[in-house]
Amino acid sequence: MPRSVHSPFLFEAAWEVANKVGGIYTVIKTKVPVTVREYGDRLCLIGPLSYKSAPVEVEAEEPGPGPFGDALRSMQDRGVKLLYGRWLIEGAPRVLLFDTGSCYDRMDEWKGDLWNLAGIPSPPNDHETNETIVFGYMVAWFLGEFAARETDNAIVAHFHEWQAGLAIPLCRKRHIDVTTIFTTHATLLGRYLCAGSVDFYNNLQYFDVDHEAGKRGIYHRYCIERSSAHCADVFTTVSHITAFESEHLLKRKPDGVLPNGLNVVKFAAMHEFQNLHVQSKEKINEFIRGHFYGHYDFDLDNTIYMFTAGRYEFRNKGVDMFIESLARLNHRLKKMGSKTTVVAFIIMPAATNSYTIEALKGQAVTSQLKDCVEQVTNRIGKRIFEHACRYSGEHGTEVPNPEDLLSNEDRVLLKRRVFALKRNSLPPIVTHNMADDANDPILNQLRRVQLFNRPEDRVKVIFHPEFLNSNNPILGLDYEEFVRGCHLGVFPSYYEPFGYTPAECTVMGIPNITTNLSGFGCFMEDLLESPEDYGCYIVDRRGQGVEESVDQLTGQLLSFTTKSRRQRINQRNRTERLSELLDWKSLGLEYAKARQLALRRAYPDSFNDDEPDFTGVQKVGVPLSAPASPRMRTGMMTPGDYATLTEEMEHLSTQDYMGAKSWKGINDDDDENHYPFPLVMKPRKRSDSLASAISGTATPSGGRKLSEKDLARADAALSNAEGVHADGVNGHH
């Protein structure tokens, strides 16, 4: 008897479940609430057990009776150590963590089985691969035990990244009755190739992937990743740019794109997040006063704070382009005679020895000056009060003589504190003593372009080689607080499968700059008619050379710097409105579509055309907004619908199925019109064949252009979709 597809179990496996390592932890953690609302206790997250993080992340429970508990007890009886309980986050999902160390005695047997099964080699000294193999076999073991006991309902297993994906080919080979989805957040080979300064996107189709992986010593890892992608029922990526990359490097065209989202906290009133910006900005101002003591000759009310942040990947994160653009911006501002000062922060962790003496001294002397001024102010206030109390109207004046307010002792104290601010050196460009100062790429480029924080420079630079936290003695802010206090985030990445940093800026109402080689940049560019009107600037790194891209970025920085305060406030309001596009309440629909597509492929007979299709028109409750909400490229779509999993246009590339029903963007920065926010999913009719779904692949430089045959096929497919006209197809490049 076939399994029921109406109440399936969902297992989601990732290396970062209850174990913060990187960005996938954020994806899993923030997505949980919407998934729990759909599945309840039919959802269980699976990951490796970290004895360091598990005690503070998970509340242990005993599994109850039933197929799930029986499967766990069966494994425990055979020596498997595991932790089952509730993840202590919003939604409190069930979580199952396997202790890979408890099965290391089986590792050689499993490595041999993997070689016989798939021809995948496994070097003995690669600890990460060893962990991946053991974890993959343990997950496949559990799924087999559970599927043998739970025979009524369908089972969906969703795997994130190659470290968790090995269970997919094992389930396929063992004929375990589970439906599998594999999501790659970045390809292994892509990261290595981009870090090697190759012209990655223009040569993507020409790489000999086996040779390149072998040359870099990651062939065995690449094989695991590729087998996971090919054996999964549904293969997805997090962005179109990664889909294009996966098609050429993993040799399978993804079935769709599942963009990353965030849990968006909406404020009751528009002014609330503006107030948070002002409060956080004042804390940054305090740091700036200390850092630039002795050369603090600029107006903080006429200062723009920019920043870039992330892992220290000098080229992949576009730090080289950012610094070059800052140097050109500095030249232009000086040439214009501008009074505006730009302070650019670079927040990236690197090897350091300690804080610099100058950075610590600056904060200390300004703090002492502030305390001294407060003491003197209190004494002056007391003298004014005493004078007013003694005034009788017969002699003296109502207001004391200003010279009598400041005593000689106060004058000496103030002079000492002010003289302590004098210094002969320039403000430092880095807050820490670097472990390898002479070879640090960021410092070397700052020296090359001569950004040394000179008094005449309009652009000042501060490199903070450590992630932010509120206990920092120099810049004591958490990352979120710091972002809220800045005016602009700059992330001109060359390789960025999605990019949470610009997304976090958007949710907090901070304008940002990204590129069309980042997943987030592609997402916003394809979704909005004029993203720059809403504070999302996109640098073209796909269709033009480096010099042109640097000039474009410099122009965007200059344009933002010359905005008035009112224009910046209006733009922040619009940027904050974009947060609804990044909310999991909307983007969670894309994961639901992927799961349904997987079930349709595994159990086609369980679906019939008379059933309502959940990919039909679904209105997302978004009110009329003030100020104006973003205008979409098409009036009939959800935030992720341009990447939706459909089956009509299997042969078309991403650009073949972009909606083109344009809305005019806002041109006036001060315009505050009201108009609707049309978030409606495109209605689609099912194809007769369930063999494939749309490929979420983009075609950056080197990709093909649309042929007449492609356009005709797109027209035919869209003409079958209710309410969507055939002239909405766009071969957009």
From Swiss-Prot:
Binding site for UDP-alpha-D-glucose: 185, 191, 311, 496, 499
Disruption phenotype: Disrupts production of intracellular glycogen.
InterPro entries for this protein: Glycogen_synth
Listed GO biological process terms: glycogen biosynthetic process
Composition-biased stretches (Polar residues): 689-700
Binding site for alpha-D-glucose 6-phosphate: 271-272, 274, 277, 281, 487, 568, 572
Keywords annotated in UniProt: Glycogen biosynthesis, Glycosyltransferase, Transferase
Listed CDD domains: GT3_GSY2-like
Enzyme Commission code(s) on record: 2.4.1.11
Notes on how activity is controlled: Allosteric activation by glucose-6-phosphate, and phosphorylation by a cAMP-dependent kinase.
Domain of life: Eukaryota
Annotated catalysed reactions: [(1->4)-alpha-D-glucosyl](n) + UDP-alpha-D-glucose = [(1->4)-alpha-D-glucosyl](n+1) + UDP + H(+)
Function: Glycogen synthase participates in the glycogen biosynthetic process along with glycogenin and glycogen branching enzyme. Extends the primer composed of a few glucose units formed by glycogenin by adding new glucose units to it. In this context, glycogen synthase transfers the glycosyl residue from UDP-Glc to the non-reducing end of alpha-1,4-glucan.
Entry similarity comment: Belongs to the glycosyltransferase 3 family.
Record's protein name: Glycogen [starch] synthase
